[in-house]
């Protein structure tokens, strides 16, 4: 009877263990690290089997009975490396684990709430870490379509010109389409390029492309962790309707000064980090800059004399006041510069009224300078109130700005006339955000992880400001004219949001995550309110099998107006207005998963997605003359996307890799008839089939090989079926009239390519040297990187009538593109 009383008392006494899990070599906190403990059902408050084993029972029988009446309780660190786990008090064995690190086991006599900070050592070889607990991504997560992108996967993938890239790695995932061949835009489950929330340490970025989309702004050396959501979205995220890319950067090495330098065909990179005075304060700095001697070849493929350059700078300082308080200050800035200059000179022989000869000299000079980029700064404060309540408070400032300046000059000199005409034009647009946010993690019981918080963002949109100056000097008479055209005045928008979600577990086989995101947007006297319910369910059947289903509603208050297949810096970001409503999406997903085979993960997911208030240009309005008239040239409609995604990943051994396949269909419809006569038409990036295989092979201690092979259906584009030469309306000339049967009426041929790279490592006295050699499009597939619509003249021999047949001109300039780079790490 005394024994039963003791068990009952223990069941009522719970203790909480909390703290940070760090990398022993660097002091960096580890995101997604696990802690677990095995407890008996009796100790955890469960029912006993009612079978008593006597003193003569064998130790093996007792062990089997103990295992049968035991269960595992686990927890996972959040995005700041903090964990908390509530378990029965008493003598326990805690196991801490992280992929690629050796497990740490710790026995403690737990009698009260306790703080335990643990450091894990990297293992000599990648091992299978058993992480039990609530993860935000992967098969173990309750969420669907949530993936963690390992840093090593990003660095090892072969890409254009040998530059590892976060966004290009995400393109390998099922359900994700790339934009133009070779470029880094992503289109997720039928959504547009502007429907992806790109976050750097919790702060959104508006333009994440360099080189017109060839690379993203995320420098791999600065990246600590990347989490990608495309199916079920945690309630703490909002603002976009298709995907979330959450990039977290390094805090800095607390153990010593370390870094790397790298040089390749495209850019040079620096990364340094270390402590300041003590391990409590750390810093991290990364910089990347471009040289253009190889990229000039790509620019010249368009037949234009141009120069291009870009840079990125990441900086971060972290200070730990105590185990309960930590302060972060982060900064990023990046710029792209595009310069174009052209000059045309000519001289002609003419005759005057009396047939006297004279020479006319003409000269025309054109220069254009275009620059754009992001700058952001943020300060975050972590505070641990107690073992069950964790908070993060942040304030941020973010700006995106684009500026274009063109200068033209026309000179003419002759015996009869003389003039000098100069014209300068500047165009500026941009966005500025000021935000404040607070997030809480609250664990009232082992079966609940409640996240809640709120955010306020003040948006300033500056769609377009034009300035021009003309100077005309004709025959010695000089005239100057200045003009300022603020085509669209400043637009202010205030966005407020609040959320709550609860990741609940019911036993070992069922988990449920309900959530609600509420958002309010105020602009020009109009208020929009969008409730966004979210829910995700996971049912585990044992032996690695699981089934998940989810529903998410998302809303978006900003649009990007683009008239081409590339995301260009001149594309405008504009907010919703009184006439343009928020974009909303509803997505339902169902999938099955298997992880019972050691080192392997398999998944099959199906989804259906409905989008409302998506924007397209009206027929005949594929571009706009100024930001003032953009609302008149676009129309709101609906879109739908549905498909099936298969994903296989091998994570252990000398050979690792992924296989992904997507079968999907995406279309749009504008029922008012202003687009495609109100009929449904395919989305530009409706690619029916998308197949990708990636492979990483260790060929020894010093050499590793990576390869990617992809094949995908072609994009859609709008082409005219015939063209007719007709008399212009003024009767003074001829004009070409195109007949277009429907929007997006032609699918480009499928594209495929093989990329590979080889890394050669060598240990040096004070670090490691890495040579990288790669080849993009290794067998020279002629996939179109640029497509234009021309016409071909055809003459009917019987009637003599001339017609013009559309003809596509396809340019391929990413062909047999080699790369190499040198990296030294210390």
Give the label of every model feature segment:
Residues 22, 34-40, 62-64, 93-101, ...:
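Short, acidic, small-residue-rich periplasmic hinge/interaction motif at the N-terminus
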Residues 41-82:
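Short, acidic Ser/Thr/Gly-rich low-complexity loop/linker segments typical of extracellular
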Residues 76-78, 100-102, 132-233, 244, ...:
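Periplasmic N-terminal accessory/gating domains of Gram-negative outer-membrane beta-barrel systems
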Residues 318-336, 368-524, 540-542, 603-604, ...:
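Face-selective signature of the C-terminal outer-membrane beta-barrel domain
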Residues 343-344, 348, 401, 543-588, ...:
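Surface-exposed extracellular loop regions of Gram-negative outer-membrane beta-barrel proteins
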Residues 424, 429, 433-437, 486-487, ...:
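Outer membrane beta-barrel strand-and-loop segments of large Gram-negative receptors
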Residues 608-610, 632-721:
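Gram-negative outer-membrane beta-barrel transporters
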Residues 702, 711-734, 749-755, 759-826:
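C-terminal beta-signal and adjacent terminal beta-strands/loops
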